[in-house]
Amino acid sequence: IDQLQEDGRRAYATIGKAVGLSEAAVRQRVQRLQESGVMQIVAVTDPMQVGFSRAAMIGIRVDGDAEAVADALEAMPEIDYLVVCAGSFDILAELVTEDDDHLLDVINRRIRAIPEVRSTETFVYLMLRKQIYTWGTR
C-alpha cells in the first residue's frame, strides 16, 4: 500500500523487489485489496484545473434522520465527499460545480428541497493548498 500511495502507477515487479515478494504475489494482493474495498487506484485531480471553477463544503443541519438525508445526497453527482458527523453540522458534503450558478442551483433547488434539511452553511473554496491520501497502514 505504501508503495502504491507514493506512485499508483508503480510496476508490480518494482514493488515486489522493494517488499520482497514476486510480481505475481503483489498483483494478487493488490487485486484482493481492491476487490475488498480497502484500496482504490485513481488519478486525483484539482477540479479547478480541469474545468470546474467552483468547489465548496456544505455544512448541513438536519431535523430527523441524518442517514436518510445522506442517502438522498449520495445520489447527487456534484457531491464527491459526504460524511455524517457530530458537531455543529449533522452532515458535511463537498461539491464540485462548473460555476457559481450551478452551485447555487444545487444548494437551493436540490439540497434545501430535502424536507429534513433545516439549514445549510456554505464554505466556498478559494485555493486548494493541500490534498493527500497517504495515511499509510497500521
Report residues per predicted region.
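A compositional/biophysical signature of low hydrophobicity enriched in polar/charged and small residues
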Residues: 1-138
